[in-house]
Amino acid sequence: MQHVFIIGSRGLPAKYGGFETFVEELVSHQQSDQIKYHVAQLSENETGKHLTYKTADVFEIKKRNFGAANVIFYDRDAIVYAIKYIKSNHITNPIFYVLGNTLGAFIGHYMKLIHKIGGMLFVNPDGLEWQRSKWIKPIQLYLKYSEKKMAEHADLIISDNQGIEDYLKTEYGSIASKVIAYGTNNLATVPGVDKPCLDEHGIQVGAYYLVVGRFVPENNYEAIIRDFMVSSTAHDLVIITNHLGDPYFEKLRQLTNFDQDKRIKFVGTVYDKEQLTAIRKHAFAYIHGHAVGGTNPGLLEAMSATDLNLVFDVSFNRNVALESALFWQIGRLTEIMSQAENLEPKKVAILAQKARQIIAEKYTWGKIVGQYEELFLNES
């Protein structure tokens, strides 16, 4: 039996972001009975309580009260507890799969402890987290240093995008590395609902551009809105994001005066998966503005559900969308929108078919989980 200890997600079942969804899907699509997953879970309870979720062993780690440093102590405490658990249960050759670089500045010490019990350390670096504008400069510097240390010490770096692996090898030289993408479900085959819940905003089916994503500057909201406002399109711009109460919303309004353009509709968040799938399916086109990170779940979902996708032109996005999308750069989205609206339906259908084919061949959760299981069973 191969025991895999997953550190760095908030736990199971998934309630939050990308890492949590990844762990949920990894456990839900488990194919091999020769793997036992042990998943750390952030908790208000005392460290050490064990729960069972599907086939996984979930072990709780008590949340500390150190503010922004909580994530560092969470990873540290999870590794320390897992090592004690491994010793007391006589587990041999465990794999530690750490999600994110947060603990990187201190990983050398814990790497020695892991090796001492015959274990291996695999790390998913989570894109280029240090580049995110939400972090103040000292935190960016810490995350960059942590990235460096993880690359130096890990037995294997698992990137979810070829662009991430290329960056790490360019930045840090020869490292043990492998690419396994993030996954998605095939939304094209999901019935969803007949009509998305957009009537209250006066939005018509098939007559809107769609943006879905976290409300952060590096997702290029300003660039998208500026170019949209100078366009002559009759379509609306529907933005699904967590903007309510965020100071960036007012800053963005002051920068762009988007409130003067009635075509721009901030509709808040949509957590109902069937509704969100319907909104994706009925969009004229999806605009993907993400500039930082690896394989983005939102882009995969768009390629699976939306026929026409306008994708920000960076290597991470090109490595995913390939020839199935139209690519735009800052200041040129208006031009790409015009191009999109002049495409013949046959051309749109070809792009949609290419996108669905890419998803089916590379990004379904069944395929991704199969790649992970092969790695865990053969690389330990």
Q: What would you call each of these model-derived segments?
A:
Residues N45, T184-N185, V212, D236-K251, ...:
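Glycosyltransferase donor-sugar binding loop
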Residues A151-V179, T184-A188, Y372:
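A short, active-site helix/loop in glycosyltransferases that binds the activated sugar's phosphate group
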Residues I7-K15, H29-A68, G163-E171, N242-Y248:
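N-terminal strand-loop element at the rim of the active site
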Residues A278-G294, D307-L308:
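Acidic donor-binding loop of glycosyltransferase active sites
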Residues F5-I7, E200-N219, I225-S232, L237-V238:
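Conserved donor-binding/catalytic core segment of Leloir-type glycosyltransferases
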Residues I139-I157:
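Membrane-proximal helix-turn-helix segments that form the acceptor-binding/catalytic region
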Residues I72-I83, N93-D126, G294:
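An aromatic- and histidine-rich active-site surface loop
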